[in-house]
Amino acid sequence: MAKEDAIEVDGIVQEALPNAMFQVELENGHTVLAHISGKMRKFYIRILPGDKVRVELSPYDLNRGRITYRMK
């Protein structure tokens, strides 16, 4: 079975939570719980509240996501 395509959306980090989790408000107004992707963790990319980020959402659970990119 092929992996389903993730939905990519942009948002702003509202709050940093324990265990590298973040509360992210998406452009459409929804709020999701997101964690950092492995490559961002590996290269110690810091994410702070107020940062604009790109989030991948699974089509199966739209309340959780993975932060894949931090905008400059």
UniProtKB/Swiss-Prot annotation:
Organism per entry: Oleidesulfovibrio alaskensis (strain ATCC BAA-1058 / DSM 17464 / G20)
Record-given protein name: Translation initiation factor IF-1 2
Gene3D superfamilies: Nucleic acid-binding proteins (2.40.50.140)
InterPro entries: NA-bd_OB-fold, RNA-binding_domain_S1_IF1, S1_domain, TIF_IF1
UniProt cross-references to SMART domains, sorted A to Z: S1
Tagged with keyword Transmembrane: no
PROSITE patterns: S1_IF1_TYPE (PS50832)
Gene name as annotated: infA2
NCBIfam families xref list: infA
